[in-house]
Structures are given as structure tokens and as C-alpha cells.
């Protein structure tokens, strides 16, 4: 399986933006990563990579060697930590990723207004426009939710960055505070234990310490005399004067640190308050926004569903649907969209708020760090020694003053500790003396002797071997004299350097005194008496005697260890002596006979202890004769050395002369002839004593050695060889000593374990024997008592048997009980025997364990030998490898120098080429800038021409639209007729086709008052968005280029290009500085990028420029309505649409004229019919109404002169005919209807009245006695006669 790709995420701490970089990181250094952040991530807002500050998620600085192990890196701008508020920088960061917030339009209310029921067509059109409005608003809501999520993510990132920078500052502060606290605790401890006030009492007690005399001393010693009273007073005065100053200084620094911590807590509270505010305001934004989206979607679908029902179901009331959409659904959609937009607005404002607050947080953190830096500098002055000022002013607190206080306190503390210190000096001086004595006289001398004896043993063995097999070897080596075997071994000389013990130790007041162990014991007793007498007031002084005793025991242990080392060194030669084999054989015999008799002494050279351990002391006595002979030989050799002044010291490879030959004595191994010749030669020439003896090889080969061969065997070692050999030998000796110490410790541990086990075994045996003896003694006593009791009872039985048989029976019972007790005792004895056997088995197991430990010791010794041999070989390999590496380094250095020279020459050759290419590139840059500016002017002019065409079309009621062609399955541009476009161009309208179908349900809303209504203008405006890139590029050009752009643009407008600016460009470019050249190099990259974006096609799609040209020509993807009259004009997109519009208007005008005539005739006929029909409800002017006489139900009195007439109606009561005077007027039909049963009249006037509590009883205001609140009408009518 392919491993998933991991990313490194960069977060901008000032706007919450982020970017991901795949791992592993392809940058070669941290500056490379910073350059990427400067160019791509921050868009050059940060201005310089030195202003970039990177932190990890743990508040630590980023290290490039671990960058691939990180997942998150947080980017900070150092300029925002200065404390000065730079609004331009923070605004640039905010505007970098604000998204589409400023482009989002605030939700607008529905365009539905109150319409009359009869206006069906307008209601239908308004409902369709409202459907498009709801869908558009739903899409806007989705965009708002997406932007809300982006803002929430950015806010969370900013909060995390605030926590990280706070953690970074806290770590910095805590580190300095921790260092300060260490010194503060030291000063506090110094102040707590100061003696500048109480030293007098301790000094007086010290003066009471008794004087004493050493065995080798010259007089009595009184330790209080070693302290100077004036010096004590001076130290006390100095401490009392300077210590308060030091304490005050540290208290001031502690107060500053506490103030910093308080400010740090305030910063933390500020961050926490911002976080709590965000939680309080936006904790439910997820669920709230989702609910709003669901509600808006549901309501929008409900609007679309109602409109679909209107087109399919005629029974649904249009007026009801219109009223529901206008009064209920549309306001809900608008309210929810407005609420969602308000949440987005609050998020945007809160993000800007925390960005603004972060500036103060950054400034406070930087201020805290600067204050801690000042504290750190003050602490450094107080704690670091100044080599240039050895004498510091007492009033100025420094490290010198603190050290002087410590020295003064140490001197004052001697008033308490001097008895203990003096005792330690006595013990240490004695320990060093004993160690030096054992080392110089015991170890060094014995090592020299033992090593020489070991060499002699090897010589003897080689000579014996040559005696047995040399005859055969001489036959094989007869032709090659150089291969003759010789009995030659290296010599050794161990000397003690710097061996004066008195000159190597300094003890001040007891330098010239020889200390004995009895002196130490006497001093300890005096110290105990001094402590027990109660003269001291210090609690710690009562423990002085215990400490002295413990130190004295350590001295004894150290001396005993040196004794053991000396004993071990003295036994080295016993392992290689001729009797060593006998010792080993005896060891085996003793080990085999150990089980038979552990107390017998083994026969042979050694003794075996109870644990089978060989005692080599007796064997060493047997080897003393050999060592004495060796010493005699060395003495004889030294005498000849003094006579001839010939060097005696040998190197490892030097050939030493056999000691058995130098003194003239005969060897027991060699022949008599050889001995005689050797003795005679040594008497003739003393220097021949130092030559290698080759008598045996000469005899075997029957040849005489030449003079050159003899000279080769001389010792030609130099002082340098001796020094190197001594160094190597010392190193090996140290290693062997360390290894020997380890093995000794292991052996000592095993011996202690064996001793403990032996003690345990002996204790168990003793306990077991004691128990056996005790039980046997107890058993004997019990048997004797029983026997006496039986005899006594038998006697009594015989005496009392005739008298009392009952007592006899009782006595028998008691006897049986005693027998049972005896049996129990015997069982206890048997059990103890079993326990004893168990202890015996345990002892056997312990013996086996001891044998195992002994074998482990042997294995460790063998391992030590292997390690020594491996170390020697590894050292040789290391030296050879180092020499080869040094040769390779020299070769590489020479190659580097050659490559450096070649590289410098190559750089000189290519520098001139680069300069010429830079000039040409800069010239081409300016040419491209002028061309791009000209293209920009042409595109803008073409776009303005297109806008003019759109205005012409809209002035004629035509609209350029883009709709989807289902047959061709592509979007086509089409010019269509839109009703009401001329009068309501800035209102929301619906484009329709010729057959009345809606072409685009999205409401057409003009965002600018001087722009056409067509949405195609916005599409083309988006297509030419790349023109703004040219404008932004021109802003970063040089002054000459910008002037040239303006001239070029104006010239292109006139149809020509300015050549004066272009001709001047090369001369200006050649005079550019390095900074300007770098600027043009960046411009070159930006121009290439801009050219690719505008003119290069990618992924099979056309370029942006070709897209604009193809679109603005309107030659492709267009729908043209063919005109039969003029095919040449109708093939043109805009001209054909305009011509068709004029012809449609003419045809439509003719059609309307004809229809108006027919409609006028039909209208006159309908009016005539309508005037002859009686109305029954909703009475209006000119309606024909039937009036009938009626009566008043609640009238108390009937007025015969007043007859009310009511209009015949359905659902419209209280319409009464005016038949009497009203405000001085009298109707014309008062007398004509007096005797009629009905009357038909045409309404001329209708007057409305309302019955209230005030006019209820008024006959004029309520002539018909109607109830309160009833609305009634008075109708003036003209009688119609048929």
C-alpha cells in the first residue's frame, strides 16, 4: 500500500490563514522556508524574512533539523511586537483573507406588493420573480455559511497562536525566574545561617577547648590560637555591612519578577476573556446556521411548489397564494437570511476585534520579555566574575562582594567547625602517609621485582624448549641465519616519579608534624570530653566525635586495602614459577579430597582452607631463593653499568641478556662449553654483558656470528622510545589496576558471602548440637525420674496392696500417662533428627553455590585477559586508520583548492554574460509592460463599446441574455424582448421569450446605476478580470515605466504607440543599481506568470485573452432569429436583433390598431347591455338599482309622512333611498314614488353613515333606528322609465 502523504501546516498568527506543504520539506535551510513564507504565504506583507518569527505548537522556536517531524508551524511578524500600533500592517493581514465578505450583498426584502385581484398577469409575474428571489437568497445563505465556517476556523487559529506566544513568553520568564530563585535561595540560606552576630559566643567556647600534644610535636597545640580575633571582627563587620545590601538588591529583583508574573496573569486573563466572549456569542452558530439553511430551503421549495400548482391546478386561488407568499413565507425567508447575515457580520467584527486586541497582547508579552532580560542582565552582573575588576566597591553589589561575604562567613564558621576540621586534617595526613608508604615501598618495588622474575621464568622455559627441539630446528634453518631462534625477551624498569610524600601534600598548620594513630585517638577522646562537658552551644558540634570515629575507620580500611594490594602484587610471579604447575596439581588434589576431610592440610606446595582456597604464602617462601639470585644478578649488572656508563633501560623490542650469564655462574640448562665461553668473554669486555647471547644457535648451526650480527643485537633504544614505552606501560598498568580492582571487589564480595554462609552453617550446627544435647539431657533426666517413680510406686504398692487396691489402679493410670509422655518425647527427638538432616542438605547446596561462584571468578579472570589483548589490537588498528584518514583529508583539501580556483575563473567569465542578459531582460520587461498596457486599453475600449450596445438594446426593450440550449446541450447568447425594460430598467424584472416563458428565474438586479441590466455584462466583466492584474503590475514598475505606460495607453487610444519612451528605456536600464536590477528580475518572473495566465491555454482550454475575444465577437454560441426580408442584415447578431425589433414594433402597432377598433365596438355593446341590468350588491355609481318600500321595526311612533325605501340587494343591507330633504336639498323623486310599490333608478351618489352612541337617538343622524355600530348608506338615484 502507498503510504498517505503527510503535510506541514503553516498558520498565520495575524489573520488565521493557513497553507499545507507536503513532506518531506524541499527547502535546504530555514531561510528557504522563510523566503517561501515571505513570497507566497504572506504576499510580501512581512517585507523581509528577518521579520519572520516561527514557533512550534509547544511554544518553542523552530529548528530546521526537526522540521520534518513537525506538523504545525505558526508564523509571527516581529514588527507587531514593538508596541507601536501599525494599523497598515494589521489591515493588510486582515484584507489578505477576508474572503467574499465585502462582495456579499445584504439580503433584500421580497418585491411582492399589494395588488388588485383583477391584476392577474402582474400577480403571476411577481410570484415568479419572488420564486427566483427565494432561490437566489438560498444560494446567498449557503455562501454565507461557508464564509462563517472559514471565519470560525481563522478565529480558532488566532486563539491558538495567542496561547502559543503566551506559552513561549511564559517559558522564557520561567527559565529566568528559575535561575534567579536558585541564587535567591542561596542568599536566603546565607542570611539564615549567618554568624556575624553570634560568633563571639562560639569563639569563647572554642577557647575553652583543651590543648593537647602530639608524640612527634614540639609543644602543646591549642586550636583556638589559629583564629585571628581581629580578622573575625573584620569579617563580622563586613558581613553586617554588605549582607543587607545584597538582600535588598535581590528583594528588588524578586519584586520585579512578581510584577512580571502579575502582568503575565493579566495577559492570560485578557486572552481568556476573549475566548469566553467568543464562546458566549457563537457557541450555537453550527446548529443555528444549519436550522436556518433548512428553513430557508424548505420555504423556497414551498414557493416553487405553490407556483407549480398554480400552473397545473386551476382550482387554487391565485389571490390566496399571492397573499400567503407576500405576508408569511417571504418575510420569514428574509428574516432568517438577515439573521444569518448578521451572524456572519458579528463573526467578521469579532475577528477584527481579536486581531486588534492581539497587537496589545503581543506588545505586553514583548514588554514582559524585555523586563526579564533586564533582570537577567542584573543577575549576570551579580553572579559572573569580572576579571578586569578584582577589587569591587563595597557599596556596589557584585559577585566579588557576594564571594567576600561567603568567605567571611566561612571564616566565622570556623569558630564552630575548627575542632572537626583539625581532626579531619590529622586523619587525612596520616592516611596519605600510610598510603604513600605502602605504594612506594610495597607496591612499586614489588612490581619491579615480580615483573623481572616473570621474565626470568619465561627465559628458563624457552631455553628448556630449545634444548629439546633446537637441534631439529637448526637443521631446518641452516641456510638462513636470520631465522635462528634466540632466547631474547624485553626488560622492564619501574621507577617512582615525584615520590616525596611531604612535598606533595599541604596541610597548613600541621605541615611539619608527623601524625601517629595514637595522636588521632587522643584527639578523639579530647573532643568527646569537650562535647560531653557541655561547653559548646552548637547542636552540630555534639556529633563531631562520631564523624571523627567514622573517618578514622575509613583510614583503617584504606590502609588494609593497600596491604591486600601489596600482598597480591607480591604473589604475581608465583603464577609463572616452575613450582606453579605443582601448585595447580596440588590444588586439584586438594579440591578432590575436600569432601573426605576438610580439616587436613594438603601435601605439596600450597595449603587449602576449609573452602578449598589455596594459600600461596608458603609457595612464595619457596620462590624466595630464585628472587634472591635475581637480585644478586641485578646488582652485578649495575656494577658494570657504573664502570662503562652504558644504558641499562630496555624498550619492548630490545634484547636483554640472560641474568644467569652476566654474573659468571653456570646455567643448569646450557652446556659447559657455552658457559665457559660466556664467562671468558664477559671478563674481557664488560660491554659484551649487554649483548644478546647466541651460543646455542651457533652451536646448532656450527657457524660463528659475524660482527654485524653482533652489532644488531645491541640495545639502540633512545630516550623517546623509553618515554613512549613508559606511557604505554603506565596506560596498560592503569587499565590492569582498574580491572584488578573490579575483580578484587567481586572477589571480596564473594568472600564476604562465603564467610556469611560459613557463619550461618556453623551457627546452624551449633544450634542443632545444643538442641540435641538439651533433648538428650532432658530425656535422661526424665527416664531417671520415671525409674525412681516406678521403684517408689512398686514399694508403696507392695506396702499398700493389701490395704487399698483402688490406689493401685490410680497409680497404674499415672504410670501409663508417664509412658505416653515418654513416647511423645521420643517422637520429638525423631523430628529434631529429621530437621538436622534438612539442615545438612541445605549446607550441601550452599557448598555447591560456593563452587559455582568460584568458577565465575575464573571466567571473569579469563575475560579480563581477552579484553587486554583486544584493546592492544584495536589501538593499533585505530592508529593506522587515523593515518589513512589524515592522508585522505590532505588530498581533499588540495582538490577543494583546485575546484575553488576553477569556480572563481568560471564566475569571472559568466559575470559579463549575465550583465548583458540582465540589460536585455530589463529592456524586454519594459517593452512587455507597454504592450500589456496597450492591450489593456484596447480591451477596456472594446468593453465600453459592448456596454453601449447593451444600452441601445435596452432602450429598445431588448435584453442580452445567456440561456441553456437543451438540443445542443450548451449555453447560448440570445437577444430577447423584455416587457417593461425601458421604464423599469433598474427594478427587478423577468426576461421572457416571445411565447411568454420565463428564461431566467434569477431576478435581474442592477448593482450599478450606470450599468446595463444584462447579466452578460457581469459575465464578460469577470472574463476580463485579468486586466486588473496588468494594473497591479504597473503599480510595482519603476517611475520611468509608469510614465511610459501612461503615454502608451494614451497613444493606443489615438491609434499609435509612443516611441520616445521606448527609445529611452535601454539608457535608463544600463544605469540601474543592484537593488533596481533585483526588482526587475522579480518583474520578469511576474511578467512570465502574467503572460501564462492571460495568453497560455491549459488543460485543453483556451486562454483568457482568446476567451474574451471569442465572447466579445458574438460569433459562436449565439441564437439568431432569422429575418426573411433581409438575410444579410439578419445574420448579424446585434444588427439583426435591432432590425427585427423595429419590424416587430411596426407589425405589433398595426395589429393593436385593428384590435382596438374591434374592442371599442365590443365595449360599446357590453356597456349598453350592462346599463339595462339591475345590480344586487357592491353598489357603485351609475348602477341600476331596484328600490322597495320598507318599514322601521323599532320605531315607537309611525310617521306617515316619512316612508323609507331600501335597495333590493343580496348581502348588502342598509342601502336607503334619499326621499326627504338633506342639508337643504330635496330629491327629485320624493312625490313621484309616493304611491308606488317599487321604483327602478340609476345611482347618482352614495353617502356613508355610521350609528354611534352619540347619534343613536338623533332622528336626522339615525332616521331608520339602526343599532349602534351599524354602517348604512344613503343613495341618490334618478328614476328610470322603461
Curated annotation (Swiss-Prot):
InterPro entries the record matches: ATG11, Atg11_C, ATG17-like_dom
Key word Coiled coil present: yes
GO biological process, one term: piecemeal microautophagy of the nucleus
Pfam family of the protein (one): ATG11
Entry keywords, A to Z: Autophagy, Coiled coil, Membrane, Protein transport, Transport, Vacuole
Superkingdom, taxonomy of origin: Eukaryota
Region span, Disordered: 586-609
Residue spans of biased composition, Basic and acidic residues class: 593-602
Assigned GO CC terms: Atg1/ULK1 kinase complex; phagophore assembly site membrane; vacuolar membrane
Residue ranges that the Swiss-Prot or TrEMBL entry lists as coiled coil: 579-641, 722-799, 834-917
Membrane topology: Peripheral membrane protein
Record flagged with keyword Nucleotide-binding: no
Localisation: Preautophagosomal structure membrane; Vacuole membrane
Function statement: Involved in cytoplasm to vacuole transport (Cvt), pexophagy, mitophagy and nucleophagy. Recruits mitochondria for their selective degradation via autophagy (mitophagy) during starvation. Works as scaffold proteins that recruit ATG proteins to the pre-autophagosome (PAS), the site of vesicle/autophagosome formation. Required for the Cvt vesicles completion.
Assembly and binders: Homodimer.
Assigned protein family: Belongs to the ATG11 family.
Protein known as: Autophagy-related protein 11
The organism of origin for this protein: Debaryomyces hansenii (strain ATCC 36239 / CBS 767 / BCRC 21394 / JCM 1990 / NBRC 0083 / IGC 2968) (Yeast)
Amino acid at each position: 500500500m502507498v503510504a498517505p502523504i503527510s503535510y506541514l501546516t503553516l498558520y498565520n498568527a495575524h489573520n488565521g490563514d493557513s497553507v499545507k506543504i507536503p513532506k518531506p520539506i524541499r527547502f535546504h535551510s530555514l531561510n528557504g522556508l522563510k523566503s517561501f513564507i515571505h513570497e507566497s504565504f504572506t504576499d510580501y506583507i512581512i517585507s523581509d524574512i528577518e521579520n519572520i518569527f516561527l514557533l512550534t505548537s509547544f511554544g518553542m522556536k523552530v529548528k530546521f533539523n526537526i522540521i520534518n517531524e513537525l506538523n504545525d508551524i505558526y508564523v509571527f511578524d516581529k514588527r507587531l511586537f514593538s508596541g507601536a500600533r501599525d494599523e497598515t500592517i494589521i489591515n493588510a493581514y486582515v484584507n489578505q483573507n477576508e474572503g467574499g465578505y465585502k462582495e456579499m450583498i445584504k439580503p433584500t426584502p421580497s418585491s411582492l406588493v399589494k395588488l388588485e385581484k383583477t391584476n392577474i398577469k402582474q400577480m403571476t409575474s411577481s410570484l415568479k420573480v419572488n420564486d427566483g428571489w427565494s432561490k437566489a437568497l438560498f444560494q446567498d445563505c449557503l455562501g454565507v455559511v461557508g464564509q462563517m465556517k472559514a471565519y470560525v476556523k481563522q478565529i480558532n487559529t488566532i486563539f491558538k497562536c495567542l496561547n502559543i506566544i503566551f506559552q513561549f513568553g511564559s517559558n522564557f520568564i520561567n527559565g529566568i525566574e528559575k535561575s534567579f530563585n536558585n541564587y535567591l535561595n542561596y542568599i536566603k540560606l546565607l542570611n539564615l545561617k549567618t554568624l556575624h552576630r553570634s560568633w563571639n559566643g562560639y569563639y569563647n567556647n572554642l577557647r575553652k577547648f583543651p590543648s593537647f600534644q602530639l608524640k612527634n610535636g614540639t609543644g602543646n597545640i591549642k586550636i583556638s590560637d589559629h583564629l585571628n580575633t581581629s580578622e573575625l571582627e573584620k569579617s563580622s563587620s563586613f558581613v553586617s555591612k554588605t549582607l543587607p545590601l545584597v538582600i535588598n538588591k535581590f528583594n528588588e529583583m524578586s519584586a520585579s519578577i512578581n510584577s512580571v508574573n502579575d502582568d503575565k496573569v493579566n495577559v492570560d486573563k485578557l486572552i481568556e476573556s476573549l475566548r469566553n466572549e467568543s464562546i458566549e456569542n457563537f457557541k450555537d452558530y453550527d446548529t443555528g446556521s444549519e436550522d436556518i439553511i433548512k428553513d430557508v430551503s424548505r420555504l423556497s421549495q414551498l414557493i416553487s411548489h405553490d407556483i407549480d400548482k398554480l400552473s397545473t391546478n386551476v382550482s387554487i386561488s391565485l389571490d390566496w397564494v399571492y397573499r400567503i407568499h407576500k405576508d408569511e413565507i417571504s418575510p420569514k425567508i428574509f428574516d432568517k437570511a438577515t439573521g444569518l447575515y448578521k451572524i456572519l457580520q458579528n463573526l467578521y467584527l469579532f475577528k477584527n476585534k481579536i486581531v486588534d486586541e492581539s497587537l496589545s497582547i503581543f506588545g505586553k508579552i514583548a514588554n514582559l520579555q524585555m523586563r526579564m532580560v533586564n533582570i537577567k542582565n542584573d543577575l549576570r552582573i551579580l553572579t559572573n566574575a569580572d576579571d578586569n575588576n578584582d577589587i569591587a566597591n563595597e557599596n556596589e553589589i557584585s559577585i566579588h562582594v557576594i564571594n567576600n561575604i561567603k568567605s567571611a562567613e566561612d571564616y566565622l564558621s570556623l569558630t564552630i567547625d575548627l575542632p572537626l576540621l583539625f581532626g579531619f586534617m590529622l586523619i587525612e595526613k596520616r592516611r596519605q602517609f600510610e598510603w604513600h608508604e605502602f605504594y612506594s615501598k610495597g607496591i612499586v618495588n614489588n612490581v619491579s621485582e615480580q615483573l623481572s622474575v616473570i621474565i626470568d621464568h619465561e627465559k628458563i622455559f624457552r631455553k628448556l624448549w630449545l634444548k629439546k627441539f633446537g637441534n631439529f630446528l637448526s637443521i631446518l634453518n641452516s641456510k638462513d641465519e636470520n631465522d635462528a631462534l634466540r632466547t631474547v625477551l624485553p626488560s622492564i624498569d619501574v621507577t617512582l616519579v615525584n615520590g616525596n610524600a611531604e612535598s606533595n601534600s599541604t596541610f597548613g598548620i600541621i605541615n611539619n608534624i608527623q601524625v601517629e594513630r595514637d595522636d588521632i585517638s587522643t584527639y578523639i577522646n579530647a573532643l568527646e570530653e569537650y562535647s560531653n562537658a557541655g561547653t559548646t552551644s552548637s547542636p552540630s558540634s555534639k556529633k563531631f566525635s562520631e564523624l571523627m570515629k567514622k573517618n578514622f575507620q575509613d583510614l583503617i580500611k584504606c590502609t588494609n586495602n593497600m596491604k591486600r594490594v601489596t600482598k597480591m602484587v607480591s604473589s604475581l610471579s608465583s603464577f609463572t614459577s616452575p613450582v606453579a604447575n605443582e601448585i595447580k596439581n596440588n590444588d586439584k588434589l586438594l579440591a578432590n579430597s575436600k569432601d573426605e576431610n576438610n580439616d587436613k592440610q594438603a601435601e605439596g606446595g600450597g595449603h587449602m582452607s576449609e573452602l578449598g582456597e589455596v594459600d600461596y604464602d608458603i609457595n612464595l617462601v619457596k620462590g624466595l631463593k630464585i628472587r634472591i639470585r635475581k637480585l644478586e644478578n641485578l646488582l652485578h649488572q649495575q656494577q658494570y653499568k657504573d664502570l662503562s656508563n652504558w644504558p641499562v633501560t630496555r624498550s619492548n623490542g630490545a634484547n636483554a641478556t640472560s641474568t644467569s650469564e652476566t654474573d659468571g655462574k653456570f646455567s643448569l640448562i646450557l652446556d659447559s662449553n657455552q658457559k665457559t665461553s660466556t664467562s671468558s668473554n664477559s671478563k674481557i669486555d664488560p660491554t659484551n654483558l649487554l649483548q644478546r647471547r647466541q651460543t646455542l644457535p651457533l652451536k646448532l648451526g656450527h657457524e660463528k656470528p659475524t660482527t654485524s650480527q653482533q652489532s644488531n643485537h645491541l640495545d639502540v633504544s633512545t630516550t623517546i622510545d623509553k618515554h613512549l614505552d613508559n606511557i604505554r606501560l603506565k596506560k596498560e598498568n592503569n587499565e590492569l589496576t582498574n580491572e584488578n580492582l573490579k575483580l578484587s571487589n567481586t572477589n571480596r564480595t564473594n568472600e564476604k558471602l562465603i564467610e556469611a554462609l560459613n557463619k550461618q552453617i556453623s551457627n546452624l550446627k551449633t544450634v542443632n548440637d545444643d538442641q540435641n544435647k538439651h533433648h538428650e539431657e532432658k530425656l535422661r533426666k526424665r527416664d531417671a525420674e520415671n525409674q525412681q517413680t516406678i521403684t517408689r510406686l512398686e514399694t508403696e504398692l507392695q506396702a499398700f496392696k493389701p490395704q487399698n487396691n483402688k490406689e493401685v489402679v490410680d497409680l497404674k493410670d499415672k504410670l501409663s500417662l508417664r509412658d505416653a509422655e515418654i513416647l511423645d518425647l521420643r517422637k520429638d527427638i525423631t523430628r529434631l533428627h529429621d530437621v538436622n538432616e534438612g539442615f545438612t542438605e541445605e549446607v550441601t547446596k550452599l557448598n555447591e553455590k560456593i563452587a559455582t561462584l568460584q568458577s565465575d571468578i575464573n571466567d571473569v579472570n579469563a575475560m579480563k585477559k581477552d579484553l587486554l589483548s583486544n584493546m592492544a589490537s584495536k589501538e593499533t588498528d585505530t592508529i593506522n586508520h587515523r593515518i589513512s584518514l589524515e592522508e585522505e583529508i590532505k588530498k581533499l583539501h588540495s582538490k577543494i583548492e583546485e575546484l575553488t580556483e576553477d569556480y572563481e575563473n568560471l564566475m569571472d567569465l559568466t559575470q559579463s554574460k549575465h550583465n548583458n542578459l540582465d540589460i536585455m531582460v530589463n529592456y524586454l520587461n519594459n517593452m512587455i509592460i507597454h504592450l500589456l498596457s496597450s492591450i489593456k486599453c484596447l480591451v477596456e475600449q472594446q468593453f465600453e463599446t459592448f456596454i453601449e450596445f447593451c444600452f441601445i438594446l435596452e432602450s429598445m426593450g431588448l435584453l442580452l441574455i445567456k440561456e441553456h440550449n437543451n438540443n445542443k446541450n450548451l449555453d447560448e447568447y440570445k437577444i430577447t424582448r423584455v416587457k417593461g425594460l425601458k421604464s423599469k430598467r433598474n427594478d427587478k424584472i423577468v426576461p421572457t421569450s416571445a411565447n411568454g416563458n420565463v428564461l431566467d428565474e434569477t431576478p435581474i438586479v442592477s448593482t450599478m446605476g450606470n450599468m446595463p441590466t444584462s447579466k452578460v455584462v457581469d459575465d464578460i466583466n469577470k472574463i476580463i478580470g485579468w486586466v486588473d492584474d496588468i494594473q497591479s503590475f504597473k503599480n510595482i514598475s519603476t517611475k520611468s515605466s509608469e510614465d511610459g505606460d501612461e503615454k502608451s495607453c494614451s497613444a493606443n487610444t489615438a491609434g499609435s504607440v509612443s516611441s520616445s519612451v521606448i527609445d529611452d528605456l535601454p539608457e535608463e536600464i544600463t544605469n540601474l543599481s543592484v537593488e533596481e536590477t533585483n526588482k526587475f528580475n522579480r518583474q520578469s518572473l511576474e511578467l512570465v506568470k502574467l503572460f501564462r495566465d492571460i495568453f497560455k491555454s491549459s488543460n485543453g482550454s483556451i486562454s483568457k485573452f482568446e476567451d474574451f475575444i471569442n465572447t466579445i465577437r458574438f460569433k459562436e454560441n449565439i441564437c439568431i432569429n432569422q429575418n426573411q426580408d433581409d438575410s444579410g442584415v439578419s445574420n448579424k447578431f446585434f444588427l439583426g436583433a435591432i432590425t427585427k425589433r423595429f419590424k416587430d414594433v411596426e407589425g405589433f402597432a398595426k395589429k393593436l390598431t385593428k384590435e382596438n377598433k374591434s374592442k371599442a365596438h365590443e365595449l360599446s355593446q357590453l356597456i349598453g347591455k350592462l346599463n339595462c341590468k339591475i345590480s344586487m350588491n357592491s353598489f357603485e355609481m351609475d348602477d341600476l338599482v331596484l328600490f322597495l318600500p320598507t318599514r322601521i321595526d323599532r320605531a315607537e311612533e309611525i310617521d306617515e309622512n316619512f316612508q323609507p325605501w331600501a335597495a333590493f340587494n343580496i348581502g348588502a343591507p342598509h342601502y336607503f333611498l334619499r326621499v326627504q330633504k338633506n342639508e337643504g336639498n330635496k330629491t327629485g323623486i320624493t312625490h313621484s314614488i309616493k304611491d308606488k310599490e317599487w321604483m327602478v333608478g340609476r345611482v347618482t351618489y352614495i353617502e356613508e353613515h355610521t350609528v354611534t352612541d352619540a347619534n343613536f337617538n338623533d332622528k336626522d343622524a339615525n332616521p331608520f333606528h339602526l343599532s349602534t355600530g351599524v354602517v348604512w348608506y344613503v343613495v341618490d338615484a334618478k328614476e328610470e322609465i322603461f
